[in-house]
């Protein structure tokens, strides 16, 4: 149902993927996730569900942010563990404070907003399961529509289409990988 998933559905040429709507696989309900996995028998889960925009929703509705990005992610991890299925979690470069750019996976995390905190919370549950890959990527649509969104932030936005092309090269990896485009401020 999300922006990235629709690009992935239309542009992906390399991976055999199935897509499930929120109604077909409700990440807020562990039984729903388990049922979806039993029915579809995936070899891996690309977890890109969650709450992202508008950014201020993470301040206005903290409960929704926690439910979708932390608890929902934990439910997906629990289900993956139950069936020994790899999870690839799309996190965000917003887990970093955004002051220097070009962050390494070894740099300390310090989110600058509640969205970053919610993605970091999701990362915590994914990190507990070793059959996993966390991709810290900050994606956006072409053309970039929010040029003045953050004037005091250094980021490495990557376009959805570029990430779709890169994804097949990453699916066998594990751990945490930062992915980004050209540094912008």
Annotate each language-model stretch with its function.
Residues 1-14:
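N-terminal Rossmann NAD(P)H-binding glycine-rich loop of SDR-like oxidoreductase domains
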Residues 13-36:
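Adenosine-cofactor binding site in Rossmann-like domains, unifying the SAM/SAH pocket
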Residues 20, 45-49, 87-93, 134-137:
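SDR active-site strand-loop-helix element
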Residues 30-68:
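NAD(P)H-binding glycine-rich loop region in Rossmannoid oxidoreductase-like domains
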Residues 44, 59-88:
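NAD(P)-cofactor binding segment of oxidoreductase domains
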Residues 74-110:
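Conserved Rossmann-fold NAD(P)-dependent oxidoreductase catalytic core, especially the SDR/UDP-sugar
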Residues 110-138:
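Active-site Tyr-X1-5-Lys
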Residues 145-175:
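Substrate-positioning beta->alpha
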């Amino acid at each position: 149902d999300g922006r990235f998933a629709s690009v992935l559905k239309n542009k992906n040429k390399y991976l055999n993927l199935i897509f499930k709507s929120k109604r077909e696989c409700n990440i807020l309900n562990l039984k729903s996730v388990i049922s979806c996995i039993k029915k579809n028998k995936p070899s891996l889960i690309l977890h890109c569900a969650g709450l992202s925009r508008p950014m201020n929703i993470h301040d206005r509705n903290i409960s929704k942010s926690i439910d979708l990005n932390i608890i929902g992610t934990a439910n997906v991890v629990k289900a993956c563990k139950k069936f020994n299925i790899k999870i690839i979690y799309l996190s965000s470069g917003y887990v970093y404070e955004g002051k220097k750019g070009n962050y390494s996976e070894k740099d300390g995390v310090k989110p600058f907003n509640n969205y970053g905190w919610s993605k970091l919370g999701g990362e915590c549950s994914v990190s507990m399961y070793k059959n996993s890959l966390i991709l810290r990527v900050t994606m956006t649509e072409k053309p970039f529509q929010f040029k003045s969104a953050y004037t005091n932030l250094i980021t490495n936005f990557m376009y959805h289409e570029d990430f779709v092309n890169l994804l097949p090269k990453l699916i066998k990896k594990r751990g945490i990988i930062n992915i980004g485009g050209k540094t912008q401020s």
